[in-house]
Amino acid sequence: MASMVAFRPEAFLCFSPPKTTRSTRSPRISMASTVGPSTKVEIPKKPFMPPREVHVQVTHSMPPQKIEIFKSLEDWAENNILVHLKPVEKCWQPQDFLPDPSSEGFHEEVKELRERSKEIPDGYYVCLVGDMITEEALPTYQTMLNTLDGVRDETGASLTSWAVWTRAWTAEENRHGDLLNKYLYLSGRVDMKQIEKTIQYLIGSGMDPRTENSPYLGFIYTSFQERATFISHGNTARHAKEHGDVKLAQICGTIASDEKRHETAYTKIVEKLFEIDPDGTVLSFADMMKKKISMPAHLMYDGQDDNLFEHFSAVAQRLGVDTAKDYADILEFLINRWKVGELTGFSGEGKRAQDFVCTLAPRIRRIEERAQERAKQAPRIPCSWIYGREVQL
């Protein structure tokens, strides 16, 4: 774990200012960190991925004896986590929200969809595309979950509760990207080829969440991320309704509902870990917050913009879709959900970790106020997802 250094306000921003010169892409994002820069390794440009940096990888940091904790929780997971999955036959499918291609009225429905889409500004589409691309990188997220010691799917069809959850969660999430992708395609408002290239680059690049094969770190990360996607899709639903597209609002709201259900499952796992191993869990929580929670799509690239994720994040921050305030809200939500501030009996190191996470959100909120002021002077830049039209950061 990197040592703590002085609190750096700029580390809490949801984006970085656009750079005037070409830079090696970095997964550095902006949300919450009070640690200094860790050692990174530059990855040279290859035909299937952009030049970038990743942190020096730490693997299998969880003590082997703690694997037994997760094996002992098999029955608990079956009774308490798998219940948050829905039977396939009761799940919505993308086609439930899209024009029926076998219908006589298909072309008229598509025409109506395209007319509604004309009322929505470009900035909103940048946010919606970014959300869709994030959802479409699902192979990476399943891969990440299967790096976690003690809970991975060892065979590809394992019947352990952890493996069943990972596969079924992936299957439920798969509908999100499918639905948004088809909707955006039919809208005619976005450059699908550039979006498809971005998805391919992103899946090829992977992600660098720094979870060290530890399910403690991994499930804290997924708890945070499911809450974040619930908020983001909820915000795009609200914006769509404000712009008069009730159907798109329904789509985004339905996806948000799924994310909320998944958040419930992941936060329940961490709650159980706090019950069994409070010291180890609070240390893991502080560790993830010191590293900062990198967004799943932080390595996105479209073949043109070396700072694409930072620019997407800036637009999302300005429009209120995904903000530093949300980050602070999520942190406070998790602290309250897991009753971190009320727990006692920690070691000295555990108590310091508890104090760190419980005092972090107010600092983030102070930085959010400064970020909002800076955003008012942000420039406009072209975005390949909307045919090179300019959007304000």
Swiss-Prot record:
<comment type="function">
    <text>Converts stearoyl-ACP to oleoyl-ACP by introduction of a cis double bond between carbons 9 and 10 of the acyl chain.</text>
</comment>
<feature type="binding site">
    <location>
        <position position="226"/>
    </location>
    <ligand>
        <name>Fe cation 2</name>
    </ligand>
</feature>
<dbReference type="InterPro" id="IPR005067">
    <property type="entry name" value="Fatty_acid_desaturase-2"/>
</dbReference>
<feature type="binding site">
    <location>
        <position position="173"/>
    </location>
    <ligand>
        <name>Fe cation 1</name>
    </ligand>
</feature>
<feature type="binding site">
    <location>
        <position position="262"/>
    </location>
    <ligand>
        <name>Fe cation 2</name>
    </ligand>
</feature>
<dbReference type="GO" id="GO:0009570">
    <property type="term" value="C:chloroplast stroma"/>
</dbReference>
<keyword id="KW-0408">Iron</keyword>
<keyword id="KW-0560">Oxidoreductase</keyword>
<dbReference type="Pfam" id="PF03405">
    <property type="entry name" value="FA_desaturase_2"/>
</dbReference>
<keyword id="KW-0444">Lipid biosynthesis</keyword>
<keyword id="KW-0150">Chloroplast</keyword>
<keyword id="KW-0276">Fatty acid metabolism</keyword>
<comment type="pathway">
    <text>Lipid metabolism; fatty acid metabolism.</text>
</comment>
<dbReference type="GO" id="GO:0045300">
    <property type="term" value="F:stearoyl-[ACP] desaturase activity"/>
</dbReference>
<dbReference type="GO" id="GO:0046872">
    <property type="term" value="F:metal ion binding"/>
</dbReference>
<keyword id="KW-0479">Metal-binding</keyword>
<dbReference type="InterPro" id="IPR005803">
    <property type="entry name" value="FADS-2_CS"/>
</dbReference>
<feature type="binding site">
    <location>
        <position position="259"/>
    </location>
    <ligand>
        <name>Fe cation 1</name>
    </ligand>
</feature>
<dbReference type="InterPro" id="IPR009078">
    <property type="entry name" value="Ferritin-like_SF"/>
</dbReference>
<comment type="similarity">
    <text>Belongs to the fatty acid desaturase type 2 family.</text>
</comment>
<feature type="binding site">
    <location>
        <position position="173"/>
    </location>
    <ligand>
        <name>Fe cation 2</name>
    </ligand>
</feature>
<dbReference type="GO" id="GO:0006633">
    <property type="term" value="P:fatty acid biosynthetic process"/>
</dbReference>
<dbReference type="InterPro" id="IPR012348">
    <property type="entry name" value="RNR-like"/>
</dbReference>
<feature type="binding site">
    <location>
        <position position="176"/>
    </location>
    <ligand>
        <name>Fe cation 1</name>
    </ligand>
</feature>
<keyword id="KW-0443">Lipid metabolism</keyword>
<keyword id="KW-0934">Plastid</keyword>
<protein>
    <recommendedName>
        <fullName>Stearoyl-[acyl-carrier-protein] 9-desaturase, chloroplastic</fullName>
        <ecNumber>1.14.19.2</ecNumber>
    </recommendedName>
</protein>
<keyword id="KW-0275">Fatty acid biosynthesis</keyword>
<feature type="transit peptide" description="Chloroplast">
    <location>
        <begin position="1"/>
        <end position="31"/>
    </location>
</feature>
<feature type="binding site">
    <location>
        <position position="135"/>
    </location>
    <ligand>
        <name>Fe cation 1</name>
    </ligand>
</feature>
<keyword id="KW-0809">Transit peptide</keyword>
<feature type="binding site">
    <location>
        <position position="259"/>
    </location>
    <ligand>
        <name>Fe cation 2</name>
    </ligand>
</feature>
<comment type="subunit">
    <text>Homodimer.</text>
</comment>
